[in-house]
């Protein structure tokens, strides 16, 4: 059983899908591991460390030769997979909705493409969930990015020269990224408030010492929502939420938006008029900018200023913490493959629940129901 870890080729992608730690663990399972030379360089993992952990290093073609499983962070370009074995697995973040044509090309190659972001939100799959591990770091980094752009301090400071007021931070969307953003902003000494469409998040917000800001008179999503995700809301709810947000946002110094809907463009949470209502020098960080953005006027890959307010739209935020993001992503992949490792067969054998959820292609066809529906 040969496992290949590729060097990422997407612009700005610094993460890597295997680390010396996970290579060592795969070797202990009985697998052969091949790592493309330089794969971990941008994340501070040297080729020598991979070799010491038991991996062989080589060119992409050498690494792919006879590989049974190909690991990636982002889905590799099908044209960059020379000589890929029929039936080989490709396990990575494949962006199936955004890169639907690429999924079809994986099928044409005869590959079995496994989209790690389709991992079901169930207890036994938590350690395999790349969305959670990467979103957690993104939420942390969003607060640091906001602090770097904000021309004032976060905590209240009482000095001989007078008092510095604490920054007011508002987090919109309380998933994994939002919860970490709340916790990080609180650690930095900010006054934090947060909102979400899911009723169950109210007590999570309170547990972190932040103030919940919720629409009270129109029903949102009870509980956690489908699989822990938000869905599209009614027009009535959207109008009530916009009114509530408008009155609250004008008093905030920092706003961090994290709202995503799987398979759909990101919901618009902040209008240009709401941006204009904020104080000059305020900062908004839009973590959903690559999916269309929560903030009107946000530009992917740029920090823009509108009405005196900075709108931060960094791409691929987890990659900006490449070492930790890689370590967690690589562990997610190892936890996934090792959980299904059949010692007698010497390879992983997926069960139906998780296999059917993440498998996009098999036998030359696209087979995932979410893509066929």
Residue map of PLM features:
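Adenosine-phosphate binding glycine-rich loop
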Residues: 117-118, 123-160, 166, 289, ...
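Glycine-rich phosphate/diphosphate-binding loop of Rossmann-like nucleotide-binding domains
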Residues: 6-45, 155-248
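An N-terminal-biased, well-structured beta-alpha scaffold segment characteristic
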Residues: 2-105, 109
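Short glycine-/small-residue-rich Rossmann-like dinucleotide-binding loops
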Residues: 68, 74-75, 94-95, 216, ...
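A structured beta-alpha segment of the ubiquitous adenosine-cofactor-binding alpha/beta core
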Residues: 54-65, 75-76, 223-255, 259-276, ...
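Generic hydrophobic/aromatic pocket-lining and core-packing "Φ" positions
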Residues: 23, 47, 81, 103, ...
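ADP-ribose/adenylate-binding Rossmann-like module
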Residues: 84-117, 254-312
């Amino acid at each position: 059983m040969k496992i290949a870890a590729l060097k990422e080729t997407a612009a700005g992608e610094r993460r890597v899908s295997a680390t010396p730690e996970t290579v060592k663990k795969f070797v202990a399972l009985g697998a052969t591991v091949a790592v493309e030379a330089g794969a971990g360089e941008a994340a501070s993992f040297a080729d020598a460390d991979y070799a010491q952990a038991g991996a062989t290093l080589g060119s992409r073609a050498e690494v792919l030769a006879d590989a049974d499983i190909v690991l990636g962070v982002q889905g590799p370009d099908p044209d960059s997979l020379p000589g890929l074995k029929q039936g080989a697995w490709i396990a990575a973040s494949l962006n199936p909705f955004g890169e639907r044509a690429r999924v079809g090309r994986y099928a044409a190659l005869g590959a079995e493409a496994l989209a790690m972001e389709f991992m079901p939100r169930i207890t036994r799959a938590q350690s395999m969930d790349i969305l959670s591990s990467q979103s957690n770091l993104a939420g942390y980094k969003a607060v640091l990015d906001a602090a770097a752009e904000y021309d004032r301090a976060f905590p209240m400071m009482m000095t001989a020269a007078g008092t510095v007021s604490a920054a007011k931070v508002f987090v919109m969307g309380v998933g994994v990224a939002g919860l970490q953003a709340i916790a990080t902003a609180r650690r930095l000494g900010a006054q934090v408030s947060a909102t979400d469409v899911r009723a169950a998040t109210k007590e999570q917000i309170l547990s972190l010492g932040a103030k919940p800001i919720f629409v009270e008179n129109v029903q949102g999503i009870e509980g956690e929502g489908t699989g822990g995700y938000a869905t599209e809301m009614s027009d009535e709810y959207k109008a009530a939420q916009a009114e509530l947000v408008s009155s609250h946002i004008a008093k905030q110094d920092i706003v961090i938006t994290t709202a995503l809907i799987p398979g759909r463009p990101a919901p618009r949470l902040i209008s240009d008029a709401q941006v204009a209502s904020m104080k000059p020098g305020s900062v908004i960080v839009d973590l959903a900018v690559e999916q269309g953005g929560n903030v009107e006027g946000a530009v992917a890959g740029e920090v823009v200023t509108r009405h005196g307010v900075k709108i931060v739209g960094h791409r691929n935020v987890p990659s900006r913490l490449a070492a930790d993001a890689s370590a967690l992503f690589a562990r997610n992949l190892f936890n996934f493959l090792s959980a299904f490792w059949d010692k007698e067969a010497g390879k992983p054998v997926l069960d139906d629940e998780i296999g059917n959820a993440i498998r996009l292609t098999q036998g030359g066809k696209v087979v995932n129901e979410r893509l066929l529906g």
